[in-house]
Amino acid sequence: MDVTDFYTDSWISDDHDGVRRVLAPDAEIDWNLDAPVDDEELVQTLHRVAAFADSVTVVARVRGADGTALVYDLVAPFGTARCAEFLSVRDGRISQVRQVYDLVAIDRYFPGLHRQ
């Protein structure tokens, strides 16, 4: 299992320690949510998604030389939101995380997720 698979499996299964284990200490993290982001906020937001979602499914994955691009379906009790994530890997750790959420669906199906 490569580091991006481990990261993905860890956050989907709500394994905080697994996510932290593969994030580089100086990882660059960026997203389109309102809240400022650092590694701890990323872990907490992934926890909130994993805890609230009925299921999280990887619907697309493209691997490149230094990372992976993923698209997730985040199924909530009343509908589905989508998230794209771009992961860069350096020295066996996730060095960059870029997340793009469908904010209209997130507000509708995961209320309060990004206005913490």
Predicted regions located by residue number:
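C-terminal and inter-domain tail/linker signature
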Residues: 1-116
